[in-house]
Design a protein with these regions (language model features):
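Glycine-rich phosphate/pyrophosphate-handling loop used in enzymes and phosphotransfer proteins
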Residues: 1-226
Length: 226
């Protein structure tokens, strides 16, 4: 509650550098590094060479594509930390704009937008779900709608930070469930703040596929290079 009040009454300050005037200043926006080609056509990871591979095909079975706007470093890392852990909710708008630009550039088509859910206990503790704020703003920018049901995190999972690749996948396997009418082959964009291995987005895509979804595309603000 306190963070919400502070967010409403304080003037905008850049989430990247704390400069007053806007939630993301032009200098920080220019400093954010867009992911560079060559990229994996499936998961969007940066590759060493056009002929290289990242090995994602054996892991991403439900997620059709994964795309991130920028690299998780510098100003965007600071902004996401403030957004996620310090309650700077107004950052949802400029961060979602970065996602929307990537969706447009990539020509990513879908029928609806859904957020990666938090478990209810963690959302109660934090006070909000940062991915839902991003998804809401992305819907506003794209005109896509929310789904006719809910994607739920049905069990608590340990934070992914610090886990190696194997434990990330094991941690979220079976952690999500679609509750609502059958999605009848409709395509879905799933939104999160940061992607590392894509394990969380893949687990969400699996649950959506079980609910009848067609292609599921994961999008995030930033991507961690591993």
């Amino acid at each position: 509650m306190f963070s919400t009040i502070v967010d409403l009454i304080l003037p905008p300050r850049c989430g990247g550098c704390h400069l007053a005037g806007s939630w993301l200043c032009e200098i920080c926006l220019r400093r954010m590094r867009r992911l560079e080609q060559p990229l994996c056509r499936r998961c969007g990871a940066e590759l060493e060479s056009p002929r290289g591979g990242c090995g994602c095909r054996g892991r991403l079975r439900s997620l059709t594509r994964l795309r991130s706007a920028v690299a998780y470093e510098g100003p965007v890392e600071s902004a996401i930390q403030r957004f996620k852990y310090q309650g700077w909710r107004r950052l949802a708008s400029p961060l979602a704009t970065l996602i929307a630009e990537r969706v447009l550039v990539e020509g990513l088509a879908a029928s609806m937008v859904v957020a990666v859910p938090l478990h209810r206990d963690r959302e109660r503790q934090r006070g909000f779900n940062q991915a839902e704020l991003l998804a809401h703003e992305l819907r506003r920018r794209t005109g896509l709608r929310a789904p006719p049901g809910r994607l739920l995190r049905i069990r608590t999972t340990a934070p992914q930070v610090g886990n190696d690749r194997l434990h990330r996948w094991q941690n979220v396997k079976g952690a999500f469930e679609w509750r609502g009418p059958q999605l009848s082959g409709r395509s879905v964009i799933v939104v999160d703040d940061v992607a590392t291995t894509g394990a969380t987005l893949e687990a969400c895509a699996s649950a959506l596929n079980e609910g009848g979804a067609g292609p599921v595309i994961g999008v995030t603000v930033a991507r961690v290079r591993i």
